Amino acid sequence: MLAFVFRRVLQSVVVLFVMSLIVFSMINLVGDPVDMLVNPESLPDEIERVRRDFGLDQPAYVQYWKFLTGALSGDLGNSFVFGRPALSLIVERFPATLELATFALIIAIMIGLPLGIYAGLNPSGWGTRIIMGSSILGISIPTFWLGLMMIIVFSVLLGWLPVSGRGEIGSFLGIESSVFTLDGLRHIIMPATNLALFKIAMVIRLTRAGTEEVMRLDFIKFARARGLSPRRIVRFHLLPNILIPIITVLAIEFGTLIAFATVTESIFAWPGLGKLVIDAIINLDRPIVVAYLLFVVTLFLILNLVVDIIYAVLDPRVRLGGSEK
């Protein structure tokens, strides 16, 4: 176990270094931040002073070396727009995005899992055709279009839910979240559902495939021969066997929910990482964009490691070292 973790940490360090080089190189090819920071009518001396203050007058390799040495000590630079450390802004906005992604994942599991099991147990029924057709639709609908339609229907026409924002934040056991207040719940329902739609479709398809595969196995036939009820078979024999691959996939997909919440957060003005990054891209705020991308890469690396360990714990047939005992 320790050897595996150590090896994965070393691999992660290499991946982070390569990604930092790629991200820093690509972001330096996109526009000049000074154009966004100064008045177009400013004198050349003023423009040069701003460029010098932010270290943009130095060669790219010098800028990258300073960034790399700073990153090793947790300093990813200061935001050009906010004048604050980029990493502190990321950490400050992360709880809102984490809350949104977690709520979206819960919605995806609560809706997708039972529908997928039903579709797997009734492969030729009309209900299954409707469910699977809807899952294809859920994968195909653009997130931004669905978000706008939800706002028009549930906020503008019906007036049931607020258009934007995070709402009132409550506290429970020292954890602050908008889901602990009624106003916060009303604010999170639409953006979380919008973010969860694609994952609902994915969970349905994963669960259906797993259910159909497991129901053909001998131990299920034996359970039926013993006279066990369908509900008991599903609860004690089907679920434990289909949850392992679903959990491992969803752990990685949780990272994608955080990484790709950008569109949803922009539509619903959710004060998380996505909105911060969109504003940073518009203003060519390089430190924020670089810090965000490296933060997401680190998150994915951690999730991958955790998934591998969980998978080995849940399934004794799996060995982290790649060998069987």
Which residues does each predicted region cover?
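Alpha-helical transmembrane segments of integral membrane proteins
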Residues: L2-A3, F94-G127, V156, L173-K325
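Hydrophobic alpha-helical transmembrane segments of membrane transport/permease proteins
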Residues: V15-W65, L158-F180
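Membrane-interfacial helix-loop-helix junctions in multi-pass membrane proteins
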Residues: R52-A60, G77-A86, E168-I188, I281-P287
